[in-house]
Amino acid sequence: KPYAKLERLMAFSDTGKCLDLTDKVKDGMLCWKAPKGSWRLIAAFCGKTLQKVKRAAPGGEGYVMNHFSARAVKNYLGRFERAFDGKFKDTAGGATAYPHNFFNDSYEVYGADWSEGLFDEFLARRGYKLEEHLPEFLAAGERSDKTRCIISDYRETLGELLQENFTRQWTEWAHRHGAKTRNQAHGSPGNLIDLYATVDIPECEGFGLSDFG
């Protein structure tokens, strides 16, 4: 399977024109005759981080999940359901009671700043197309007010996806099974207060640490 999937291919002219060329890419080849002028092409790909779970508990080894994807989180929680219901070979012999709490030990997924379908989510939530502003979004150096607004909207969208698709779905799932959620939200790409408010027991670690030597 390919390491990354093309999400958008955008062309930007020196006169301010923007074209979406995504549907002109077939089998990895672009079929497009550029109009007169100077054009800059920006391709946006979505791929896997290939990160493994850190300090995994027995049975929890493997790749990290996509916290922004409702489907990925649902699949992850479904594995726990099958385990507690005794539907795995190594758990055959009857169901096991769910614990009183499920604990999320902080957000430690580095470089995970995108998700499949994020362009569509951005449009639905922010009301404009992020792909049409990729030059500003990716610009280095001093940021203009417009660029700051675009980046703020992008971060808000990621935060909403994390809260809705991971934190809220996880908490609602736990409640259906008579359990509560404990969460360390620090490190998450979202509004920490909102994330803490979405769980039953907010926790933190190392907040405001001082070196007492």
Walk through the language-model features, giving the residues of each:
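Substrate-binding cleft/loops of secretory-pathway carbohydrate-active enzymes
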Residues: 107-116, 180-212
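Short, well-ordered alpha-helical packing segments
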Residues: 77, 81, 119, 159, ...
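Aromatic-lined carbohydrate-recognition surfaces of secreted/lumenal glycan-active proteins
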Residues: 98, 103-106, 154-191
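Core alpha/beta catalytic barrel or barrel-like domain that forms the active/cofactor pocket
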Residues: 133-151, 157, 182-191, 199-203
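Secondary-structure transition/capping motifs at alpha-helix termini
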Residues: 87-96, 171-180, 195, 209-211
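Small-side-chain structural scaffolding
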Residues: 11, 174-176, 199
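Mature extracytoplasmic enzyme cores
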Residues: 1-152, 160
